[in-house]
Curated annotation (Swiss-Prot):
It holds the Pfam family Cut8. Keywords: Cytoplasm, Nucleus, Protein transport, Transport. One of its GO terms (cellular component) is cytoplasm. Residues 34-54 have a biased composition (Low complexity). Residues 392-412 have a biased composition (Gly residues). The gene is STS1. This is Tethering factor for nuclear proteasome STS1. Binds the proteasome. It is found in: Cytoplasm; Nucleus. It comes from the Eukaryota.
Length: 437
């Protein structure tokens, strides 16, 4: 094998020579040595196949070339200063744009600062995680996606209306049906309702009666005669309802056994029965025999009610019933005699003449009692004769020709005969055989 190596050797000049002399400058020599391995010839001698050394000499530079001149040094300093200024301006502009990054980049490493910043970074991460968890919990709470939060949200379930709200929503018709249904289911509620319900006023009852009469008239046919049988059949249900309502109201205003209510109710009772009789006059006069029978029977019952109200007891000694002067005031206030005359004319019923006689007799009796008690003389207006218990009056009666009214008895006139005389309808005229089709 052959190896090559390079060796630098410096030949130093002799001492004492001028160092500035170019000839005395050191020279460097490059030795190139190549060695070849010896090979055995087989004779026991080794021969150097190739072994030689080559010397290469490099020409040295002059000292002036090696040492820069003063001008070159100054120029180099200027160049260095200019380059330093440029780098500083560049660094300043770069630091203005990226101040934080440059400071962190050129900041000296400090292990304590790194530890504090790491802890701060961890705390910030923990705060962010907690904030994100809170947001998720809020979302679960509002959207109900979390099973644990569903138990905290109250479940809204529909419920029926309270009883008070149901009653508010009902109109008059449905409210009446509800009350009737309750009474049918629980009959014991009748007494409770009558106790707690306020008493109806006269104006309200008259208004209800007029409304029922208006419903009856509104259901009359347009193309047929009002007095025909077809018209009667059309309004028959409404007529029955009207008469039933009238009967209940009349019975309500009749005097009861409680004398304390008699004085208070008499004037209202007379007013109501007067208006009720006028309402009957306004009903169509159907030719149907059934209606004619019902109409005459209604007038007869009203006349009986008139007599019952007129013939109430007047007793000043016991303090029950009406005073003597109270009835006289009521008759004058209501103009009762004139109203009864009009009812007799419009209805064609002779029974109203007996009601007028009863009113006149009642006024005459009161005047006689007052004259006896206070010594008042009424002159020719009233003549009283008491022979064998007979009393006669000279007042004129309706449709009677001025004969007045007479009573016979043992002490005072009674109203039982007048009530018994009120049944004047011949019911044989309304038998099935005599009905007109």
């Amino acid at each position: 094998m052959m190896s090559a190596s390079f060796h630098w050797k410096h030949r130093s000049n002799e001492q004492g020579k001028n160092p500035l002399d170019k000839s005395a400058m050191p020279s460097s020599t490059l030795h190139y040595m190549s060695t070849n391995n010896s090979t055995n010839n087989g004779t026991g001698t080794s021969t150097n196949t190739s072994g030689s050394s080559s010397h290469y000499t490099i020409a040295p530079r002059s000292f002036s070339e090696m040492v820069p001149s003063q001008q070159q040094q100054q120029q180099n300093k200027k160049r260095k200063r200019y380059s330093d200024d440029d780098s500083e301006t560049h660094n300043e502009t770069h630091s203005e744009n990226n101040n934080d990054t440059s400071q962190e980049q050129f900041k000296p490493h400090n292990h304590r600062d790194q530890t504090a910043s790491g802890l701060l970074h961890l705390q910030q991460q923990q705060l962010q995680q907690q904030h994100s968890l809170l947001l998720l919990q809020q979302l679960h709470y509002f959207h109900g996606s979390s099973k644990t939060k569903r138990t905290k949200i109250p479940k809204i379930i529909g419920q029926p209306l309270p009883t008070s709200r149901l009653i508010e929503s009902l109109d008059k018709t449905h409210l009446e049906k509800l009350l009737h249904s309750l009474i049918d289911i629980h009959p014991e509620l009748n007494k409770t309702i009558q106790k707690i319900t306020p008493k109806p006023s006269l104006e309200n009852l008259l208004l209800i009666l007029q409304d029922k009469h208006a419903q009856l008239i509104d259901h009359l046919p347009y193309k047929c005669s009002e007095t025909s049988d077809y018209s009667y059949l059309r309004i028959k249900p409404y007529l029955q309802e009207f008469l039933s309502c009238l009967e209940d109201y009349v019975l309500y205003y009749l005097p009861s056994n409680n004398y304390s209510e008699t004085k208070h109710k008499l004037i209202q009772s007379l007013k109501f029965i007067d208006e009720a009789t006028s309402t009957i006059h306004k009903l169509p006069n159907f030719t149907n025999s059934e209606y004619q029978y019902m109409r005459n029977l209604t007038y007869e019952q009203l006349i009986n009610c008139w007599l019952i109200l007129v013939n109430q007891e007047t007793n000043c000694d016991t303090g029950n019933g009406l005073d003597y002067t109270e009835f006289h005031k009521i008759v004058e206030e209501l103009d009762l005699l004139e109203s009864l005359k009009q009812h007799g004319v419009q209805s064609g019923q002779e029974g109203f003449s007996k009601v007028i006689e009863a009113v006149q007799n009642k006024l005459g009796q009161n005047q006689i009692l007052l004259s006896r008690q206070f010594g008042i003389d009424y002159g020719n207006d009233m003549t009283v004769s008491s022979s064998n218990g007979n009393r006669s009056g000279t007042g004129a009666g309706f449709g009677g020709g001025g004969g007045g009214a007479s009573r016979s008895g043992s002490g005072s006139g009674t109203s039982s005969n007048a009530l018994s005389d009120m049944i004047t309808v011949d019911y044989s005229l309304y038998s099935l055989s005599n009905r007109s089709v």
